[in-house]
Amino acid sequence: MNIAICGMAQHDKSEVDNFNGEIWGLPWDEGRWPFFDRYFEIHPLDLLRKPEAQRRDGYEDRLKSLPILYMQEAYEDIPNAIRYPVEKVVDNLGLDYFNSSISYLMGMALLEGADKIGIWGVDMADLEPVPGDPSYISEFAYQRPNMEYLIGLARGRGVDVYIPERSPLAKFHGEGIPLGLMYPSYPQRYGYL
């Protein structure tokens, strides 16, 4: 089974269009939603209904219109919602470690025995706009290590995981790593100039 996992960062849509397998994504990614085979909305419905969730008007109706939608529960108000099998996924992974919606897609792909997983639009770029700026933090600072762990777990199980070259996922970033009072730039791997 081949699975494409699509996030919302810029990516080459033609690569996804040419992917031979199921395409999974997020329901709030409305620019590309018509071609997803499965959707995952892991946030609890009571939180999604709050204005602070910043979901657009009619978002709940959108959820009701999706063909295959995984949520925390099979909500009565969302009749097409399928309960995400979190216990089975955790048992399969051996660890209850999810720091993003995308990580739940990876967990499901591993549970279902994917042979190949392609990951597009999932950069989780936690880099500061100005290197060394300690005031900058993003949610990706804790989401990315989780995703990279799941990528490593998948590869350790023999799953072919494709990550586009332009994505920073599972790639070394050699800027801003201090050595005493210096900040050397390592081009390919830590410690090597």
Feature roles, as predicted:
Residues 1-193:
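Metal-ion/cofactor- or nucleotide/acyl-coenzyme-handling active-site neighborhoods
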